[in-house]
Amino acid sequence: MGYRRLGLRSDHRRAMLRNMVTSLIKEERITTTETRAKEVRSIAEKMVTLAKRGDLAARRQVSEYLFDEEAAKKLFNTVAARYKDRPGGYTRIVKVGFRRGDAAPMVILELV
């Protein structure tokens, strides 16, 4: 599907998304372009849902995707506990204007 490539090869795109999800979990807020934020959001929502499950298989799946073991620990111990009663919608996208240089629409992606 050409509309989800983000202008990158598949290996670069996957690495970028993994980096951004890891950063989102560690920092709880990142600034990026709108298109990238929408892609990261869907992955981050799935990671939080896996963490809420909390079993060993879920822990292994999350650890395999995230680059940082500290981020995985935070996801299971802090973030999953925060959203235990919430049935989805763990992230928020807030528009912040346009990037100087190429006028790309910029947003803040944050955990609610």
UniProtKB/Swiss-Prot annotation:
GO molecular-function terms, A-Z: structural constituent of ribosome
InterPro entries in the cross-refs: Ribosomal_bL17, Ribosomal_bL17_CS, Ribosomal_bL17_sf
Alphabetical list of Gene3D superfamilies matching this protein: Ribosomal protein L17
SUPFAM superfamilies documented for this protein: Prokaryotic ribosomal protein L17
GO CC, alphabetical: cytosolic large ribosomal subunit
Family matches, as Pfam families: Ribosomal_L17 (PF01196)
Record key words, sorted: Ribonucleoprotein, Ribosomal protein
PROSITE patterns reported for this sequence: RIBOSOMAL_L17
Sequence similarity: Belongs to the bacterial ribosomal protein bL17 family.
NCBIfam families for the chain: L17 (TIGR00059)
Subunit comment: Part of the 50S ribosomal subunit. Contacts protein L32.
Protein name: Large ribosomal subunit protein bL17
Species assigned in the record: Desulforudis audaxviator (strain MP104C)
Name of encoding gene: rplQ
